[in-house]
């Protein structure tokens, strides 16, 4: 055993974990680029690619499950295997799914040979590629142009680079998926950093990573060409940076948080939701500093104010640049163009309770758990959220009995254990807040407000609730079935994973620890079953 430990330490000295994991992500991203961008490799029969993936994925998964159950694989190797599984899963999906499959508001591109300006995410990217500049038109005149430009600027430059290297235009646009594949891998690494920061290890860590590794929603986003995956990555960076600042309140960490929020808003405006829990954390800390200043003097107060001013300057200049630009040039406030009121997606005819209340049993429609765009088929926000989280907007009419049973089982397990995991997460944050209160009892006034444990629990708990509440408000403001898509709050998977990871560390009672273990096992089972179901209905489609 000591020999293995020594070997492990040597490997760790030779290759830091973060560098190794980033290398894995880059390897699979380049693999997807070559398989889609080099004509000879792109011509390999799809059956071969599908077959190889279908052999390797279960093997990797079984090794990981063996390590989770027996504990005979070291943590470093387990993390390595989970990242490999994630990237193989996402890379296979990108390679086996075309540019026009399962996209949202994709639009079209007509190529550099004409002067046509096209709508949709592809049109936005093509504009930058074709005209070598950002659009100077009113962003609400063409669909999808209202989005902030960061993702589209990166994508446009990527197409320019690939075509400049000699790649055919069609293949270059197909390889837009490589960027979102890269983002999905980096998202998992940031999730790992957050979980390690919170003290996660062992089965709790593995179950949380497995949720983010195999959850179908992240697989779908890894092959998308819109801005959702980059936005999700940057929100995760905000969470990571804020937790780092809570532990050590330095100006560089505060500015890193400001930059993450600013870039997130420059990717998608709904990143602003993270500002609410961040603002609460700042408020708690500043109130604690004010209490302390009665004994230590006002110097700390002025230092805090200076730091917050710099934070606001960096995050505001970067994050609000697009909003201010549209307001000055076109007198346009942020918003989303909506379909017509008589659209089949409109849910205006239904009451708020029918849309946002607890769904009736009939609303769940367990017999066919897929999302139909018509509000007559389904109009409850939470039902649509669960369906799109597993199967996106797939509607496989004529699906045979066996795949359908797999999907039904995954759907039921996801509802039961997903809800239980959400409750577990919130309960753990409350437990941490009460523990912080107990630790600081009898201390100086304001000690609780500056307690890292208390700030952490408030930041995470209110952050999760802010995303759920923001999601509900969004569906009220834009009352269409498409507004209830889980992709808008896919970062909630990270919060769920945090709850799963922390449960193995914080719950020591016999009953509570067993209950948490059942929830972790149930979430992992639902995730694995959902990924298998999606692979069957999306990739194989033998019927």
Label the predicted regions.
Residues 241-247, 274-316, 340:
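Perimembrane helix-loop-helix junctions
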Residues 167-171, 191-214, 232:
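Transmembrane-helix signature of polytopic, membrane-embedded enzymes
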């Amino acid at each position: 055993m000591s020999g293995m430990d020594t070997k492990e330490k040597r490997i760790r000295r030779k290759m830091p974990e973060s560098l190794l994991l980033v290398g894995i992500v880059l390897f699979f991203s380049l693999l997807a680029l070559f398989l889609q961008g080099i004509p000879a490799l792109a011509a390999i029969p799809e059956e071969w690619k599908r077959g190889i993936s279908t052999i390797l994925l279960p093997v990797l998964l079984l090794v990981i499950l063996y390590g989770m159950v027996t504990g005979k694989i070291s943590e470093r190797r387990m993390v390595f295997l989970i990242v490999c599984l994630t990237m193989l899963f996402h890379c296979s999906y990108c390679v086996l799914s075309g540019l026009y499959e399962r996209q949202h508001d994709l639009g079209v591109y007509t190529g550099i040979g004409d002067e046509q300006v096209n709508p949709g995410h592809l049109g936005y990217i093509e504009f930058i590629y074709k005209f070598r500049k950002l659009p100077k038109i009113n962003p609400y005149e063409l669909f999808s142009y209202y989005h902030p430009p960061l993702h589209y600027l990166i994508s446009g430059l990527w197409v320019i680079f690939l075509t400049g290297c000699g790649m055919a235009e069609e293949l270059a646009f197909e390889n837009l998926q490589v960027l979102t594949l890269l983002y999905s891998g980096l998202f998992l690494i940031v999730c790992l950093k957050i979980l390690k920061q919170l003290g996660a290890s062992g089965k709790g860590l593995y179950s949380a990573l497995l949720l983010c590794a195999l959850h179908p929603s992240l697989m779908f986003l890894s092959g998308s060409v819109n801005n959702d995956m980059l936005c999700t990555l940057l929100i995760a960076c905000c969470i990571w940076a804020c937790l780092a600042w809570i532990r050590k309140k330095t100006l560089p960490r505060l500015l890193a948080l400001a930059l993450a929020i600013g870039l997130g808003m420059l990717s998608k405006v709904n990143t602003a939701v993270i500002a609410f829990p961040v603002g609460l954390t700042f408020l708690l800390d500043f109130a604690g500093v004010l209490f302390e200043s009665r004994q230590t003097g006002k110097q700390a107060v002025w230092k805090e104010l200076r730091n917050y001013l710099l934070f606001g300057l960096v995050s505001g200049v970067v994050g609000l640049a697009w909003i201010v630009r549209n307001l000055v040039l076109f007198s346009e406030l942020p918003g989303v163009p909506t379909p017509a009121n008589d659209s089949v997606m409109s849910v205006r005819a239904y009451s708020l309770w029918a849309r946002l209340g607890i769904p009736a049993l009939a609303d769940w429609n367990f017999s066919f758990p897929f999302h139909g765009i018509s509000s007559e088929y389904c109009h409850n926000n939470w039902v649509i959220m669960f369906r799109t989280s597993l199967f996106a907007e797939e509607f496989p009419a004529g699906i045979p009995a066996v795949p359908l049973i797999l999907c039904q089982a995954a759907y039921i397990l996801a509802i039961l254990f997903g809800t239980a995991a959400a409750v577990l997460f919130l309960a753990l944050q409350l437990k941490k807040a009460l523990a912080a209160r107990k630790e600081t009892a009898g201390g100086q006034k304001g000690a609780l407000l500056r307690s890292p444990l208390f700030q952490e629990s408030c930041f995470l708990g209110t952050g999760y609730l802010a995303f759920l509440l923001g999601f509900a408000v969004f569906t009220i403001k834009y009352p269409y079935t498409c507004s209830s898509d889980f992709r808008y709050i896919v970062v909630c998977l990270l919060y769920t994973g945090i709850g799963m990871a922390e449960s193995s560390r914080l719950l020591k009672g016999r009953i509570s620890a067993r209950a948490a273990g059942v929830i972790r096992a149930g979430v992992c089972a639902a995730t694995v079953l959902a990924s298998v179901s999606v692979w069957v209905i999306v990739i194989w489609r033998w019927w």
